[in-house]
Amino acid sequence: MYKLLVALHLILCTVSHVKTRQRWTALTPEETLFIYTRCQEEHLPADNNSRKTYIENWHQWKLQPNDHVTQCYTKCVLEGLELYDGKQKKFRPGRVSSQHVAYQFLNGATADEVAKYKGAIDALEPASDSCEDLYMAYFPVHETFVNVTRKLYHGTVEGAARVYNSDPNLKRKNESLFTYCEKHVYGDQNREDMCRGRRYELTGSDELRNMIECVFRGLRYIKHGDINIDEIVRDFDHINRGDLEPRVRTILSDCRGIQPYDYYSCLINSDIREEFKLAFDYRDVRSADYAYIVKGNTYDAQKVIAEMNKVEKHVCG
């Protein structure tokens, strides 16, 4: 039991962006990578030719071209990093200080340049919270302080590597969230229960409950302590089953219980069990590479099934 409590503590600390917070905490490399790639995923155009241009610019930290696509991508990132509060309609310069203090011995940024960046953000007064007005207000600051921003938000190879090396509990790049959670919850213990869980059996064990807790938080299925139905619906949409949205919402709204395992059980015991398994498996594949869709990959059911079978065989034999 002690091992389970320690494992759960590690999970809640390392997948920190999705835990219930009493106060804001600095963003980890996993969190900033999720924010940037999710905003790219949501705002990149479908056209492959123009898509390539945006990706090349944004990955080089260039907020170009100056058009509606880049403007809304910029707003998405500012809100994701919580540098801008969409509800209060104001910038949050204090976030810059908190982010720096947390990683000041690892990110390579100096106190002086961080203070200047914070001051520049503090002085911003956008005409409105529209994509265009936020972009026009922030763009000059970005151009002046882009190198500071990269250091603060783990956008340099060297800085990110130092952070990862300093904390073995962080989810690694190219590591699926499911593998990460299995490692921290199960370790080398109770492999039978873990493999039954991989086969979508509801064992009810403490380990599986903690495993689902870890996965739901990491997938952002939990937001501000509550079930994030929008995120789950989004995963159904990615397997081309957006038509099931009303059913998903009904199942989760009617579900008794408050723990992630309860919601997971309701989906597994529902009439859309098989579709949920497909959506969950596809999210597992994508969780190993947050840029999976940005790179142009699309849903292929047989490819996902083959990948999951490969992983299960490796893990469970």
Curated annotation (Swiss-Prot):
The keyword Secreted applies. GO terms for molecular function: odorant binding; toxin activity. Female salivary gland. One of its GO terms (biological process) is sensory perception of smell. The keyword ATP-binding does not apply. Keywords: Disulfide bond, Hemostasis impairing toxin, Platelet aggregation inhibiting toxin, Secreted, Signal, Toxin. InterPro entries: PBP_GOBP_sf. SUPFAM superfamilies: Insect pheromone/odorant-binding proteins (SSF47565). Residues 1-20 form the signal peptide. One of its GO terms (cellular component) is extracellular space. It is found in: Secreted. Disulfide bonds join C39-C76, C72-C131, C181-C214, C195-C316, C255-C266. Belongs to the PBP/GOBP family. This is Long form salivary protein D7L2. It comes from Anopheles darlingi. The lineage of its organism: Eukaryota, Metazoa, Ecdysozoa, Arthropoda, Hexapoda. The gene is D7L2.
